[in-house]
Amino acid sequence: MDNFENPLLAPDQDVLLYLLDGYSQLQQLQKQQFNIHDDNINYNNNNNNNNNNNNNNNNNNNNNNNNNNNNNNNNIGSPQIMNENIETNSNDPQYLERLQSIQQQQHQCQTQIQQQLQNYQQQYEDQYQQRQQQYQDQYQKPYSSPPLNFNSIPPITNNNNNNNNNNNNNNNNNNSNSNSNSNSNSNSNSNSNSNSNSNNNNINNNICINNNDISIFLLNNQIQLQPLQQQQQQQQQQQQQQQQQQQQQQQQQQQQQQPTQPTQPTKPIQLTQPIQLTQPTLLEELKDISIQQQLLSAIQQTAQSPQQIHPLQQLQPYQLQSYQQIQASQQLQPYQQLIQLQQLQLQQLEEEKRQQQKQLLLQQQQLQEQQEKLQQQLLQQQKQQLKQKVKQQKQQHQKQQPQQQQQSIQIPPELQNYILNNNNNNNNNNTNKTLSPISEMIQNQFLNNQQTILNQNNSTLQLPTPFYSPQQQQQQHTPISSFIPPPSLPSSPPSPPSPPSPPPQQQQQQQQQQQQQQQQQQQQQQQQQQQQQQQLQQQQLQQQQLQQQHQLKESYESKESIKKYNQNIASRNYRLKKKDYIKEIENKIATLSLENNRLEKENGSIRTNGSIEMMRMEPESMKMLMDGKLIIENIKHALIIDDEKSLIYLLHQYHRTIDQRYSLLEKEVNKLINPYTQLRLCCIGYVPKSSPLVLNIFQGPESDKWLNLFKIEANITPEQSIKIDSLRFQYGKVSSRLSNELLELDLIIKRFFIKNVLPTPDTPLLNSDYYSEGELIPNTTTESIAPLNNFELLDFASKLESLKNKIILNASLGLDTFATLCSILTPKQEALLLVRVNLFCIDLHHHDILGEVWTNVNQISNSLSNPLTSFSDSMKKINFSFLQLDNNNNNYHYKIN
């Protein structure tokens, strides 16, 4: 191994490392492919024929031994020949003992081979690590295995041809030896012993592999192998030759063994344990040997093709684990795909089942509906059929009764004469003779016919009996004895009971006559039956025609009745709809009339009162003011009682009622900010400069005094006072800016009205405050006013919109600052603030009374025709309004208390 240290240090020569590590892994791969344990591996070697080349002596016995050895070596893999040997030698105890010893030797060889392989692997790993360190020390970089250059590997040569030549020479020697064996019995015995010994030696040679050969394979890599196909062909040829030779030998041995017997006595063999070895176990061992040969051939094939070996010597332990995980995941991928496919198939099957169930349910519903329809149709058909049957039975009964009466009355004259003759004979003779057999037959037939007629009458009488005339009733009540059926009676009168016997010729003639008469009667009966059938068919046709006519009439009548019924329903529905429509129109007319009256009253009040009703506050805002006032009164009462829970509840209620204050404020501003009100303010000369008299708690010197007193009363902390002062400062800045913007917009709007809407020629300026001193108004007339442009109109509308927004911002500024001030304070302090400020201090009752007084005063000023009466009426109204004011105040205080 020391010879290979120096060349392995170069990075270009790493082939032996690959082969050394590849052989140990190749052994494991072959085990996995054939599913064979380590205990059953037998490394057979076909190169044992070298012993034959070294032992070519002149003695015939030695040549026989060598030839037998070669034959046994070549025939180990053939199961047919071994089966024959097993059959011949399975009962020999020596053979069994030898097999046992062979098995032990085989096991020992296997253990030795495994130990040697382990030692080689350990040595290789140690040397590989040492060489890596040497490489790193010399080249100062980590070792990396280069790619394999198979061109550098020496070519593989075949040396098995020499072995084959040796085998052929040995086979020729066998033929000569076999001839010599046939001459003497002693030589045959010696040959048999020598054959047994040679078998043992050859088996041992095949089982045990020389350690030197393994070392040569591992180190030098100069094992000369043969391709797999050529080797198989050679083995087949050898097996065929060996089979032919063995057959010849067996024939010769059989010829020799018949006259001879074994001379050498066999010694008894004492075994420690009883060996039970049967033919199948031996066959299994031989099969294992053949499998081992296949393993060796596969190893040789892999040695010939080193490109297929994966260079696993480069992988570290952690890399091997990752490699194994990747292989496991690759193996599991197809199973996962199969599982996914099965899941998809299951989902599809479930969906198909659901669809089938839905279809079945729909089909069942349809079948049920069809069954119900069919049942209804069957019931209707059954009812119609019953009606038709009843009608048919009535008609048949009416038609059959006169026919039965006629049949019952018609009696043939022959029977009447016969009955009269019988009665006369009985009266003359005064004998109690019995009737003749003919008369008895006639009577029996008569009675049977009577019974059938009675049964028919009973069946027909189940229906309601029709009305008969008196003649028909008499015919019906005639005695039953008068009814005699016409058939089965001879036309001639019967012969007397005791006449003289006529001759045979006369009897024959009489019989012939009787037969002719009977035939005539039968023909007549057939004709009558045919006539009756024709009559019945005609009657049935007539009945069917009548039924069809009756059905047509009924269908026509039913259709007409349905039409009449539908017409009645349609007319009734039309009348009801007409009534409903008339009622709707009347209600609409009533509502329109009420609206008209209300509008007339409003117009009259507007004319008289000067549009006071139009300027009235909205009912929603009035409701909000009244509710807020009531809540503040309740808060005042809770402060007196010092009830914190009620205060908190009332404050929540107060904030809930004030939610709509912004929307109501916009509605009130829209009433003021429009061209009509602005025109009136401009005509009047209104100037929004004067501040209101209401106290503003956020701005001005008076607010400072009020807030200082409130802080003392509400026990406000210094932190709260700082926040309140900063809030007031911010409010002052924003309110001053908004007030200036409002004044500018108001001036611009007033100038627009004065220039374009109210040009008064030769008149001085009404309010000189709007203009500067040098500004003059042009002396114009209505004719000289130019039309307005669209741009000017849009600009004026935008100015009005901005004025509305500024007013809303100014009003909402006060509300927002008040809300932030309430958030700074505690609930009790907030309640004190609401009670002291009282934003909802407007008394709407007083305001309404003042409006009524104003309307009455205007009416007094307008009524000039009859001033006394109008003045007295107006004074009455004023007094009445004052009385209402007092009553409202009393009611309001009563509600609060």
Curated annotation (Swiss-Prot):
Q: Where are the residues of the annotated region Disordered?
A: 38-88, 128-198, 461-516
InterPro entries associated with the record? bZIP, bZIP_sf
Q: Where is the composition biased (Polar residues)?
A: 76-88, 141-157
Regions of biased composition (Low complexity) lie at 44-75, 128-140, 158-198, 506-516
According to the UniProt entry, which residue ranges have a biased composition of type Pro residues? 484-505
The UniProt entry, under Gene3D superfamilies, shows: 1.20.5.170
The residues forming a coiled coil are 94-137, 228-258, 330-407
Query: Could you cite one Gene Ontology molecular function of this protein?
Result: sequence-specific DNA binding
Q: Which residue range or ranges hold the bZIP domain?
A: 557-620
Record keywords: Coiled coil, DNA-binding, Nucleus, Transcription, Transcription regulation
Where would you find this protein in the cell?
Nucleus
Q: Which PANTHER family match?
A: CREB/ATF BZIP TRANSCRIPTION FACTOR, GLYCOSYLTRANSFERASE-RELATED
Homology family: Belongs to the bZIP family.
- Name of the protein this chain belongs to: Probable basic-leucine zipper transcription factor R
**Originating organism:** Dictyostelium discoideum (Social amoeba)
What lineage is on file?
Eukaryota, Amoebozoa, Evosea, Eumycetozoa, Dictyostelia
